[in-house]
Amino acid sequence: SLVKSDQICIGYHANNSTEQVDTIMEKNVTVTHAQDILEKTHNGKLCDLDGVKPLILRDCSVAGWLLGNPMCDEFINVPEWSYIVEKASPVNDLCYPGDFNDYEELKHLLSRINHFEKIQIIPKSSWSNHEASSGVSSACPYLGKPSFFRNVVWLIKKNSAYPTIKRSYNNTNQEDLLVLWGIHHPNDAAEQTKLYQNPTTYISVGTSTLNQRLVPKIATRSKVNGQSGRMEFFWTILKPNDAINFESNGNFIAPEYAYKIVKKGDSAIMKSELEYGNCNTKCQTPMGAINSSMPFHNIHPLTIGECPKYVKSNRLVLATGLRNTPQRERRRKKRGLFGAIAGFIEGGWQGMVDGWYGYHHSNEQGSGYAADKESTQKAINGVTNKVNSIIDKMNTQFEAVGREFNNLERRIENLNKKMEDGFLDVWTYNAELLVLMENERTLDFHDSNVKNLYDKVRLQLRDNAKELGNGCFEFYHKCDNECMESVKNGTYDYPQYSEEARLNREEISGVKLESMGTYQILSIYSTVASSLALAIMVAGLSLWMCSNGSLQCRIC
């Protein structure tokens, strides 16, 4: 009689993880390990970007800051900034009502500037033939008194005269210069002559690239900030060695200060109501800072810095481990003991904690689990490289900042919004499809690795062991721990055990043949006995029918 056979089984790791992923074919597949690649959290603060503070304008607008609204004095001189923060509806904008020409274009320009240096180009004291201090308004109060924008000068007539102005400034700096000026549009003709003496006036501005002539538009208007008049402001970039020339006989708002663009770089004007959080980040959104190495986020579509890509998804999880189907109980099943990971295994091993794939053996010396370190390490390297590759490919650094349009460009704004929404939809679809496909490939990859490990053992053992169909092999010979180890490390000596295996196979086959012979003898005896009994019954019935006349019997 044979003793209980030694066995070796191929299996895979399982744990208590409840992480779930989606694949092309399935949803909510529980896996042993997974990695979230969608950032969903932020700190709710405005932070320094790579150590450089933002310029947070608080209650001031960009126009209020650049022109010098008296309520924005804290921004008269500002250090280098990483990005600019402006509220959606800042209180301190153009205190004197009017318009800022090409304002949106100026903001776009600021998205490529990190530092201004304010310099005086035409001193206020140089206007000896005009009144340079009387140009103030109650619309721009400071300390309870009428005031005006700090960086421009509202020139008024002096001694009932407004001589024609001819003034030039040559940019001798090495940097570009942002120059601002304006025109006043009075409420009526009386205000025109009261302020400028001349009833018909103009302003001419010229550079190597600019040729502008402005005339005031006198009209009756509703009061804003107590004013019926309006002011319109303009700007230009004056290149090094270029000159700007002004000529006017009235209504001129002259530049006193200009901004030297001393540092260009990636910046942005971000609309946000948040406060400064005394923190540092690599990625800022209007909702708060993101500190993450993930390739995607769903916090806000507008960002500045080294940011993940925005997608509309709520969940993006990459499978890194295996299907997690722990073996619940050890019982015989038609398809074996373990799990369907390789088509024939029905459950993972929680007892194997030091690897993804491995072995369980049992012999007279005992039983135990052992991970296959080589295949596990190769799999870990492969999955890690794949995840890192996905992150690297998707984590291209870029900015998505809001674009502003004036009232005449609403159709362009709507078209731009539709295009951006379309791009976001495409990115979201691509990200979700990428995750589904990679998860399918990862789980198939693990399946393949388990199958390869099984084939490695099968090819070594050949007919020295029997495949049980559940990931296990039953040896036809004694296999001690040294023998088991040789199977695991691929050095199993088939010839050494082949004779013992052959004898045991033959003994098992003999028992089967003997059982089959006995079965056949019993079958033949049973068939003959049944046939004889049937013949006797037929003969008896015939004799009885002949004796009572029911059947005529003739013997020839």
Curated annotation (Swiss-Prot):
Disulphide bonds in the chain: 9-472, 47-279, 60-72, 95-140, 283-307, 479-483
Family matches, as InterPro entries: Capsid_hemagglutn, Hemagglutn_HA1_a/b_dom_sf, Hemagglutn_influenz_A, Hemagglutn_influenz_A/B
Membrane topology term: Single-pass type I membrane protein
A GO biological process held by the record: virion attachment to host cell
PTM entry text: Palmitoylated. In natural infection, inactive HA is matured into HA1 and HA2 outside the cell by one or more trypsin-like, arginine-specific endoprotease secreted by the bronchial epithelial cells. One identified protease that may be involved in this process is secreted in lungs by club cells.
Ranges of the Extracellular topological domain: 1-520
Keywords: Clathrin- and caveolin-independent endocytosis of virus by host, Clathrin-mediated endocytosis of virus by host, Disulfide bond, Fusion of virus membrane with host endosomal membrane, Fusion of virus membrane with host membrane, Glycoprotein, Hemagglutinin, Host cell membrane, Host membrane, Host-virus interaction, Lipoprotein, Membrane, Palmitate, Transmembrane, Transmembrane helix, Viral attachment to host cell, Viral envelope protein, Viral penetration into host cytoplasm, Virion, Virus endocytosis by host, Virus entry into host cell
Glycosites: 15-16, 28, 170, 291, 489
Further details from the record: Major glycoprotein, comprises over 80% of the envelope proteins present in virus particle.
HAMAP family: INFV_HEMA
Family: Belongs to the influenza viruses hemagglutinin family.
This protein's name: Hemagglutinin
Organism taxonomic ancestry: Viruses, Riboviria, Orthornavirae, Negarnaviricota, Polyploviricotina
